[in-house]
Amino acid sequence: ELKITVLGEGNTDPVARNDVGVIAEDSTLTVSNGANANLVGSYDATGEHSGDVLDTSSTTHYDTDADGDTLSVASVRTGSVEGSGTAGTLGQALTGTYGQLTLSADGSYTYEANQTAADALDLADSVTDVFNYTVSDGNGGTDEGTITITILGINDAPVAQDDVGVISV
C-alpha cells in the first residue's frame, strides 16, 4: 500500500472588516492610508474601522491575511448584501442612494453626498448609504466587507420667495 501525504501550506482567505464613515449632507468624505480627518460629530464605530478598506494601521480593526499576502480590492457593488446590487468599476464613481462612492484597488475611497438626494434631511436626521466590496489576496483567497456611510442632515438656510399680490379698486 502506497500512501501519499501532501505537505505544504494552502492559501488562507483574507478577512475583510466592515468600514464606516460619517459625513454631512453637503460634504465629501475622503479616506486614504487609514487616515480619516473628515469625520463629523460623534459616531460609535465599535467593531468597525473608519480608515481605508485595507487599513492596516489599526491593531484590532483591520483587514488581514494569515499568509501575509498583499491585499487589494477586487470589486465593489451597491447595497449591503455581498455580491448583489449594481456593480461598479474600481476608480470610478458608483452611485448609491444618497451619493457616489469612488473606491480604488488600494482601498482608499471618496464618498460625495448628493445634496439633492439628502437635502430633505433635518439637522437631527441621518440616513445610510451602503456598498459591499471584495478584497483579494492575489492567490485566489477573497472575502467581502461593507462600507456604510452615514449622512447627517444639516440646518439648511431658509429660501425666500417673492410675494405677488393684486389689489382691485
Predicted regions and their residues:
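Acidic, turn/loop-rich segments in luminal/extracellular domains of secretory-pathway
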Residues: 1-10, 86-154
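Extracellular ectodomain surface segments
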Residues: 13-94, 159-169
